[in-house]
């Protein structure tokens, strides 16, 4: 196979690996933690993985405490927890 063909194959394999969702067994345990806005009163839009819908959904983070199921962007959440690309509901305030 030519070097151009090998390069194309490598590129396609890399793309496939990036786009293949993580299976539930490979997903970090913290992806299954419930949404937790924390105890502080800031108003910071964040995203959490919702295992019931297999989506990353918005919520309002208070700025302290909470848990590790808390991402600055939807893309970070999807990449870490392997969520589907469907858009979840708008951010909501989670009650403790």
From Swiss-Prot:
One term under GO cellular component: extracellular space
Disulfide bonds, paired cysteine numbers: 31-81, 40-64, 56-77
Signal peptide: 1-24
Localisation per UniProt entry: Secreted
Claim: Signal is one of the keywords in the record: yes
Gene Ontology molecular function, alphabetical: serine-type endopeptidase inhibitor activity
Residues in BPTI/Kunitz inhibitor domain copies: 31-81
CDD domains: Kunitz_PPTI-like (cd22608)
Residues forming coiled coils: none
PROSITE patterns recorded: BPTI_KUNITZ_1 (PS00280), BPTI_KUNITZ_2 (PS50279)
Annotated site location: Reactive bond for trypsin: 41-42
Record field: transmembrane: none
Modified residues (Pyrrolidone carboxylic acid): 25
Pfam families linked: Kunitz_BPTI
Expression sites (tissue/organ): Expressed by the venom gland.
Keyword annotations: Disulfide bond, Protease inhibitor, Pyrrolidone carboxylic acid, Secreted, Serine protease inhibitor, Signal
Role this protein plays: Serine protease inhibitor.
UniProt name for this protein: Kunitz-type serine protease inhibitor 5
Annotated source species: Daboia russelii (Russel's viper)
């Amino acid at each position: 196979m030519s070097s151009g063909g090998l390069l194309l194959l490598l590129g396609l394999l890399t793309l496939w690996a990036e786009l293949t969702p993580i299976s539930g067994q490979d997903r970090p345990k913290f992806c299954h933690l419930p949404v937790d806005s924390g105890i502080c009163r800031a108003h910071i839009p964040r995203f959490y993985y919702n295992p019931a819908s297999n989506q990353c959904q918005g919520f309002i983070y208070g700025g302290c405490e909470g848990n590790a199921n808390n991402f600055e962007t939807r893309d970070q959440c999807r990449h870490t927890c392997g969520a589907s690309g469907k858009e979840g509901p708008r951010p909501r305030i989670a009650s403790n």
